[in-house]
Curated annotation (Swiss-Prot):
Modifications the protein undergoes after translation, according to the UniProt entry: One or more lysine residues are methylated.
Name of the protein in its database record: Large ribosomal subunit protein uL11
Alphabetized NCBIfam families for the sequence: L11_bact
Assembly: Part of the ribosomal stalk of the 50S ribosomal subunit. Interacts with L10 and the large rRNA to form the base of the stalk. L10 forms an elongated spine to which L12 dimers bind in a sequential fashion forming a multimeric L10(L12)X complex.
Length: 141
């Protein structure tokens, strides 16, 4: 019989840098799972994506065992990396901080496709463009 999921924990952790310190430790401690076991496994799985923030969904079972699914980095993180900026605009409608090309948007949309609720690449690109605009980026052809 399949194990019963007791709790789902969602976190965003820098790839390869999970530690028992907050925010990871307290979130996992409340769920009652082995914090060191999770951090070692997460760091091993995400070592190749250093520098990115990786969303993770941890399923905690009744017997306190767990497994987790890593997702693709948030669109905002990928956009900032592609544009080479530290952060988006505080006033996106007035102040534009960077320019990004449609080719870069397409590349990000292809990366994010498994996690996006989009039927095709074109709609995924529109989602990414919307995120870029809300961050104060200009999208050019």
């Amino acid at each position: 019989m399949a194990k019963k999921v007791e709790k789902l924990v969602k976190l965003q952790i820098p790839a390869g840098k999970a530690t028992p310190a907050p925010p990871v430790g307290p979130a996992l401690g409340q769920a009652g799972i082995n914090i060191m076991g999770f951090t070692k496994e997460f760091n091993a799985r995400t070592a190749d994506q250093a520098g990115m923030i990786i969303p993770v969904v941890i399923s905690v079972y009744e017997d306190k065992s767990f497994d987790f699914i890593t997702k693709t980095p948030p669109a905002a993180v990928l956009l900032k990396k592609a544009a080479g900026v530290e952060k988006g605009s505080g006033e996106p409608n007035k102040t534009k901080v960077a320019t990004i090309t449609r080719a870069q948007v397409q590349e990000i949309a292809e990366t994010k496709m498994p996690d996006l609720n989009a039927a095709n690449l074109e709609s995924a690109m529109r989602m990414i463009e919307g995120t870029a605009r809300s961050m104060g980026f200009t999208v050019t052809d």
